[in-house]
Amino acid sequence: MLKKIISAIALIAGTSGVVNAGNWQYKSLDVNVNIEQNFIPDIDSAVRIIPVNYDSDPKLDSQLYTVEMTIPAGVSAVKIAPTDSLTSSGQQIGKLVNVNNPDQNMNYYIRKDSGAGNFMAGQKGSFPVKENTSYTFSAIYTGGEYPNSGYSSGTYAGNLTVSFYSN
């Protein structure tokens, strides 16, 4: 049976063994302006977010940002998904919303790009990992909603949940 040892959703005060792994805002995810990383890792830098710079509107299947993680000792499974994601066509779809224009949003799913273990794009649930192994995931653009053609520059915010489990 898997035991959850680290959760990104909440830090439960006074509970040993539970550590907040991050609830992140992608604060400068601009379409036409260079962006800068704004992520504070909370578990010895085990997880980090790397945004992507845009010169134009994202195209379908474009990479919005990447997630790199090194699995801490004692961890045998990971769950990674956009917080508050919806299931569509068997995938968990998250949303990045323009802070200044909430009508504009980018839908995406998480895809595993490297590392051992099987993980299908947008998969629900946890998947097996090996401790001290590095993994790379990408947030892949699947479309969006906007009132006019193209996105405006601005801050696109969203949350990602990463949970680590041990046997």
Curated annotation (Swiss-Prot):
Keywords: Fimbrium, Signal. It is found in: Fimbrium. Residues 1-21 form the signal peptide. It comes from the Bacteria. Pfam families: CssAB (PF16831). Its main location: other. GO terms for cellular component: pilus. InterPro entries: CssA/B, Fimbrial_Assembly_Comp. This is CS6 fimbrial subunit B. It comes from Escherichia coli.
